[in-house]
Design a protein with these regions (language model features):
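Charged catalytic cores and adjacent phosphate/nucleic-acid-binding surfaces used
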Residues: 1-91, 161-173, 277-385
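A metal-dependent hydrolase metal-coordination microenvironment
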Residues: 85-266, 270, 300-312, 332-339
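Extracellular glycoside hydrolase catalytic/binding regions
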Residues: 272-274
Length: 385
């Protein structure tokens, strides 16, 4: 470990005392004989003003490194020791569920991206209702800008006769656009040009895939219904999903999750405890979905500030975990305005531990459960996972 002051104030050229203490092992005043995770060193600055010592951290977790000159503590740093599973992974903060004015949000896609980068986000996907192209619009808007924000394609998937909200994060083609005569309409596309954005620009991002060659063939609504009904025959759907409407919805969810994976994306089951008159989904439907988990990740924290959504979803997550069901989780704002005066703009986020801040590495890390969902409703963040 090398410690070097960055300012003009340097270490005195005398011997310093350095202590290392593991946060998990209790205070040395109360437990003076507990040696594991606690150590003491003597060091004098070298010709470059650097204090150096060598320590083999015995435990995973947080450590305090404290430096003393005589009896005065002059510096404290926190460091983390990790096991091999976290070695090389860098924590990244982001959002997997956001809206712009292209559906029912307020700001342009590029404004949403800029606002979340200003807040410190490392990655995001714009996931407008029914629409894939706004996420490409956000990416295209910064094609000539050197920036550190990773933007991936995304959409909130709303297929006919399925009222469950599903997020496609990072998919290479649109799931919504697999059905003919769906959003966006030609009139919507025709209205996209504006000052600084030409028709030629629009043609490069108003697409239904990252590369148009990746687009699967479209189908009619009736063809979609037939595919879902055929899939439903192969699923062991229990009696608790007790009518044809719900049975179709569950089968449609499985079909959509499969299609998102076919698009090389991450399939997210979103906010079952969102209150839309009543809870969006019945308790039995939510229970079965979480226990079967045909999705890739559960949006355990979503965009509402009332307790019944995030509180109930968190309780449900820990309850099913205690029963032996395990699945990846994420947290997102589901924000419809990215301006800081919107109280819901930063209510939740996800910390992911990928090897790289890029689409596939983020997806793999989430699938492998290297995530923490962060509730930002209060000043003091609360963590889930």
């Amino acid at each position: 470990i090398n410690v070097k002051p960055r300012g003009v104030r340097q270490f005195s050229n005398v011997e310093h005392r350095i202590t290392v203490s593991a946060l998990s092992e209790g205070g040395t005043r109360c437990f003076p004989d507990r040696k594991i995770g606690n150590a003491e060193f003597k060091a004098t600055p070298d010709e470059n003003g650097v204090l150096s010592f060598t320590y083999d951290f015995p435990l995973e977790g947080e450590y305090f490194i404290r430096i003393f000159n005589g009896d005065s503590r002059i510096l404290q740093h926190n460091v983390f020791a990790v096991n091999e599973d976290l070695a090389g992974r860098i924590p990244r903060i982001g959002d997997l569920h956001l809206h712009s004015c292209r559906s029912d949000g307020r700001e342009l896609p590029e404004t949403v991206a800029a606002n979340y980068r200003a807040f410190g986000y490392d990655f995001l996907a714009l996931t407008d209702h029914h629409r894939y192209y706004p996420s490409l619009e956000a990416i295209y808007s910064y094609k000539d800008v050197d920036h550190a924000l990773t933007m991936v394609p995304g959409e909130e998937v709303h297929m006919s006769r399925n009222f469950v909200h599903i997020i496609s994060f990072g998919g290479k083609f649109s799931i919504n656009a697999l059905i003919k005569d769906t959003f966006p309409t030609q009139a919507e596309i025709d209205n996209l040009p504006r000052p600084g954005v030409t028709k030629e620009d629009v043609a490069k991002f108003a697409l239904r895939a990252i590369n148009e060659s990746d687009c699967p063939e479209q189908m009619t609504h009736q063809e979609f219904y037939a595919k879902v009904e055929e899939l439903a025959k192969t699923l062991d759907i229990p009696d608790c999903i007790n009518n044809d409407v719900e049975r179709f919805m569950y089968a449609a969810c499985v079909w959509e999750f499969n299609k998102i994976r076919e698009a090389d994306g991450l399939a997210i089951f979103a906010h079952p405890y969102w209150i839309s008159d009543m809870f969006q989904l019945s308790e039995s439907f939510t229970d079965y979905m979480l226990k079967q988990h045909p999705f890739d990740a559960f949006e355990v924290l979503g965009g509402e500030r009332y307790y019944e959504q995030n509180g109930f979803q968190t309780a449900k997550y820990y309850s099913t975990r205690s029963e032996g069901y395990d699945y990846p989780i994420v947290g997102s704002t589901d924000s419809h305005s990215s301006n800081s005066e919107n109280a819901g703009a930063y209510v939740a986020r996800t910390m992911v531990f990928p090897f790289e801040n890029e689409r596939k590495s983020l997806i793999n890390a989430i699938k492998d459960k290297y995530t923490v969902a962060i509730d930002g409703i209060l000043a003091e963040p609360r963590l889930v996972g």
